[in-house]
Regions:
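Transmembrane-cytosolic junction motif
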Residues: 16-40, 44
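Alpha-helical membrane-embedded segments
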Residues: 8-18
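Conserved aromatic-histidine-acidic binding/catalytic patches
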Residues: 29, 33, 48-52, 56, ...
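Short hydrophobic helical membrane-anchoring segments positioned at the boundary
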Residues: 149-235
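Acidic, Ser/Thr-rich low-complexity segments on the non-lumenal side of membrane proteins
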Residues: 42-78
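Feature marks short, highly hydrophobic, charge-poor N-terminal signal-anchor/signal peptide-like helices
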Residues: 1-9
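Short, structured secondary-structure elements
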Residues: 77, 81-160
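Polar-ligand-bearing catalytic/cofactor-coordination segments
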Residues: 34, 59, 235
Length: 235
């Protein structure tokens, strides 16, 4: 085999691998978007949150899909959950053990472990996961993650549904800086613009990192999604 032919075959192989990875990611994303949640899941959520209507539960399920898509699009890197009520639905979904295991294998190629909902703090791993989640949910809704004019659903959800213990966000940090929300929750307000700031832990890891590329990196072995170590820590 001549050297030019070898280089040509190498380039062709690399191109085919990239195309195959993109196709697989697209198939997995469509699977997440169209997946039918197990029967009875909303009823279990409403036992935790009796104030939720069926329409509210459907909105929560849409937000949870955003979280799963963020994990997929990150290359199956660690992502943190920003919503208390979406976290509740995620936790209830996990209790459907067989359904959740099959979902994870089909959507990610491996199991996604649960990690509790968090906000920006001094905990660097959680912050990295939140920034990564923010980046990909913004891109999902065509929002500029560096200068947002509105919030992606996953970050707006707790305030929208008036979740008493929820994490309430605003897009514009210049007008509100962790004041009382003025609603029934009486909680703090968190700012979308803070995800590009290094003031919390001295860095911006996870914000628009290399995982945000739409290329490959989703191999079941090399992506970190091939076994039991995907996502965050256990409960």
């Amino acid at each position: 085999m001549t050297f030019p032919l070898f280089i040509t075959l190498l380039i062709l192989t690399a191109t085919l691998i990239v195309m195959w990875n993109k196709l697989r990611k697209a198939r997995r994303a469509e699977y997440i978007r169209s997946y039918s949640l197990p029967d009875g899941l909303f009823e279990r959520l409403r036992k935790r949150r009796p104030e939720l209507t069926l329409k509210d539960c459907q909105l929560v399920s849409h937000a949870l899909r955003q979280f799963f898509l963020a994990y997929l699009k990150s290359g199956c890197k660690f992502v943190s959950m920003p919503s208390q009520v979406a976290d509740d639905l995620w936790h209830e979904f996990i209790l459907y053990t067989k359904n959740y295991d099959l979902f994870c294998k089909s959507a990610f190629g491996g199991f996604l472990h649960h990690s509790p909902a968090v906000v920006l703090s001094t905990a660097q791993q959680n912050n990295t996961g939140l920034r990564r989640c923010w980046w990909h949910t913004c891109r999902e809704e065509n929002i500029n993650p560096r200068d947002p004019t509105r919030l992606p659903l996953l970050f707006a959800l707790d305030a929208k549904l008036k979740v008493a213990d929820g994490f309430h966000y605003v897009a514009d940090c210049r007008s509100v800086r962790r004041k009382s929300t003025g609603n029934d929750s009486g909680g703090a307000v968190y700012c979308g613009g803070d995800f590009s700031s290094s003031s919390f832990d001295g860095g911006t890891d996870g914000f628009g990192d290399a995982s945000s590329a739409d290329g490959g990196g989703l191999g079941d072995g090399g992506s970190g999604c091939g076994g039991g170590g995907c996502g965050g820590g256990g409960d």
